[in-house]
């Protein structure tokens, strides 16, 4: 019996009056995941397009694959590179992940398979916990409200998993996605009604609730007992010269062979997926352009001002682009159509605000070298206000024509 036939056979149990009526949202989510919705427009449609919400969300999900697969490889590569340089660390590792990796692969940093299996052993459990726990909350709220499960959770789950450090405990992953889905989205009415990005809301909760597992030098590499600073931390402590002196070139940072979150290190891989989003017009080019212009503008201004005590003032814009979570946030987080500005002019302002804020936080805030998460959440709060003033300005301009 095929999947379609099986789903059709049990459908009556989930319909109104069936014994599993309250779980219709779960059935519908599974059915929609495998097949397109069976309902069609009966009357004349005012807008006709080849893409619906499901296809749009699946496209975004697929566009994260370059960053996802490279992130898995790089997570394993960074760990195996440390094991090759410090064999005593390899001998001290323990736990179920280490046992699983040892049974499927080795620890050779020159082996594509070894690196990928090592990284997958960290990313896939994080993604699985995110998907299962977050999916539970989605189905629960959909069942209570008696509506369908929205496909947007496919995007939220993978984005949340990709912005976490590889060493994060799985129970914290469950707490973070629960906070992001429930507090960041569902309490406001669900998809389309939230004003904060759910994935970033969950990460912000973890950052402030469990800073030891979300920041510092010991969380970015999947090796117990090892501390390795990110490129941004090195720059914050000693400028770009400190980054280069530690053997990290701009090309290393661009390709992504550096310490960092599971899916944020490779600007190249992120840009591949991001360009697809721009070409398909799922992501707004105005927001992306605004983020870039805001970041470049303030970076150049701070370069001109300079500082004898803060080396971050001298950080060039092209380094801001490839370190931290800037690229990932610009393409996948800032362009969230729900929490971003809606008007065309507002999108430029919204993007520029993010670009300016991320540089400002990175350069001026001594306690927080990364700024993309806070910059986007800050802009999310102002998005409705930005759109309000843009609309009011347009109304005044149109009224002035008739005076």
Curated annotation (Swiss-Prot):
UniProt-recorded name of the protein: Na(+)-translocating NADH-quinone reductase subunit B
TM helices/strands, residue ranges: 56-76, 121-141, 163-183, 220-240, 265-285, 287-307, 312-332, 348-368, 371-391
Function: NQR complex catalyzes the reduction of ubiquinone-1 to ubiquinol by two successive reactions, coupled with the transport of Na(+) ions from the cytoplasm to the periplasm. NqrA to NqrE are probably involved in the second step, the conversion of ubisemiquinone to ubiquinol.
Record PTM FMN phosphoryl threonine, positions in chain: 230
EC number(s) stated in the UniProt entry for this protein: 7.2.1.1
Family statement: Belongs to the NqrB/RnfD family.
Gene Ontology MF: a single term: FMN binding
InterPro entries (alphabetical): NqrB, NqrB/RnfD
Cofactor needs: FMN
GO CC terms: plasma membrane
Entry's localization field: Cell inner membrane
Entry keyword annotation includes Signal: no
């Amino acid at each position: 019996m095929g999947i379609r036939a099986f789903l059709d056979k049990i459908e009556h149990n989930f319909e109104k009056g069936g014994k599993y009526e309250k779980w219709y949202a779960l059935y519908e989510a599974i059915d929609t995941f495998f097949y397109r919705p069976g309902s069609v427009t009966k009357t004349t449609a005012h807008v006709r397009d080849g893409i619906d919400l499901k296809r749009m969300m699946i496209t975004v999900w697929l566009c994260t694959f370059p960053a996802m697969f490279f992130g898995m490889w790089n997570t394993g590569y960074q760990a195996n590179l440390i094991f090759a340089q410090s064999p005593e660390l390899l001998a001290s590792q323990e736990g179920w992940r280490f046992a699983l990796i040892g049974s499927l692969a080795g620890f050779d940093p020159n082996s594509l398979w070894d690196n990928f299996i090592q990284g997958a052993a960290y990313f896939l459990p994080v993604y699985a916990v995110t998907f299962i726990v977050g999916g539970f909350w989605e189905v629960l709220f959909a069942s209570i409200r008696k509506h369908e499960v929205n496909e947007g959770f496919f995007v939220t789950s993978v984005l949340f998993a990709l912005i976490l450090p590889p060493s994060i405990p799985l129970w914290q992953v469950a707490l973070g996605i629960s906070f992001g889905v429930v507090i960041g989205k569902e309490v406001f009415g669900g998809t389309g009604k939230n004003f904060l990005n759910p994935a970033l809301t969950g990460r912000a909760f973890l950052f402030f609730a469990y800073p030891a597992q979300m920041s510092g030098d010991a969380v970015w590499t999947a090796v117990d007992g090892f501390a390795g600073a990110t490129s941004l931390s090195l720059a914050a402590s000693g400028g770009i010269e400190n980054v280069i002196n530690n053997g990290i070139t701009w090309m290393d940072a661009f390709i992504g062979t550096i310490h960092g979150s599971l899916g944020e290190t490779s600007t190249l891989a992120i840009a591949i997926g991001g360009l697809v989003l721009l070409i398909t017009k799922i992501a707004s080019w105005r927001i992306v352009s605004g983020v870039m212009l805001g970041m470049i503008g303030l970076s150049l201004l701070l370069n001109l001002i300079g500082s004898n005590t803060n080396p971050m003032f001298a950080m060039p814009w092209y380094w801001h682009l490839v370190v931290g979570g800037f690229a990932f946030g610009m393409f996948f987080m800032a362009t969230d159509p729900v929490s971003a500005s809606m008007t065309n002019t507002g999108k430029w302002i919204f993007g520029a605000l993010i670009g300016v804020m991320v540089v400002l936080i990175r350069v001026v805030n001594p306690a927080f070298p990364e700024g993309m998460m806070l910059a986007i959440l800050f802009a999310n709060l102002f998005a409705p206000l930005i759109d309000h003033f843009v609309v009011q300005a347009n109304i005044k301009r149109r009224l002035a024509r008739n005076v």
